[in-house]
């Protein structure tokens, strides 16, 4: 057995194999603080709402946090910011530990192999991912796993480009960061991140429209489409504007990095876009349109999107973990054959 874990700013997901099916478990990576009362804690426990009590406060954690925040008019708090553990949140480590324990569960055997997603250092910020990676490694090791980080962009390659010999450009549009990896036969040629993602879109939209950030997030995740037929001045119109701006920014940085890395011009590769921020209908077409106007020196033969972009990094992490387990003497097939419906704990 082996597992994959996507530790994202907005969502944490695990992937494991059950026969021919890949099973996903998901929780939102957030929490909200409410006042403690005996009655409130009893109701939360009876309703299976994930929570912990500390002194005179109760912290609702995971998927239910956003619902409670909207009901009580509060903002959710995040253990992570810009793709890594938040230095501004004192409760970051205990909260993310609780969520990870719920999502990944206990190992099926001692030192079970687990690959967890790791962002690349951003090229447009002085943020370092080292503390984040080592903290997660220690946390997962204490849980009984044998953890190994995998670059988030490379996980996309493992997940989506097996049919192209793991060759192509993977772009993971997350909440805190956008991760990019160009791989050739499963060997990374270029990998980096950009310190902008879905959170940046939400924050800019909230500021422009005077709407609470959590409300903007809810609208974006509900039925928002990138069709540009929304009323000017509304939240959806602002979301469309900042989505376009993010794509311009990402592609400009890809062009710059390709030039600096002196990537061979004769390459002809597919591009895969994944991540929760790429979920709105119309995203693939918009990205492809912006890519056509770029000066990237290699050829792009297609732009691929997938039906469930949120699960790509977790799935790729699982593929890598199972492949390494097999090379170490296991008998597992590194390619999951089917996907089960995601679970939420």
Curated annotation (Swiss-Prot):
Record field: compositional bias (Acidic residues): 334-345
SUPFAM superfamilies (alphabetical): Actin-like ATPase domain
Disruption phenotype: Essential, cannot be deleted. Low volactin protein abundance delays rod-to-disk shape transition.
Region spans: Disordered: 318-345
Entry-linked InterPro entries: ATPase_NBD (IPR043129)
Keyword Cytoplasm in record: yes
Organism domain of life: Archaea
Record keywords: Cell shape, Cytoplasm
Subunit structure: Assembles into dynamic filaments. Filaments assemble and disassemble independent of the division site.
GO terms under cellular component: cytoplasm
Upper classification of the organism: Archaea, Methanobacteriati, Methanobacteriota, Stenosarchaea group, Halobacteria
Gene3D superfamilies: 3.30.420.40
Subcellular location: Cytoplasm
Keyword Cytoplasm: yes
Function: Actin homolog which is part of a cytoskeletal system involved in disk-shape formation. Could be an early molecular marker for the onset of transition from rods to disks. Volactin is highly abundant in disks.
Chief location: cytoplasm
A Pfam match: Volactin
Name of this chain's protein: Volactin
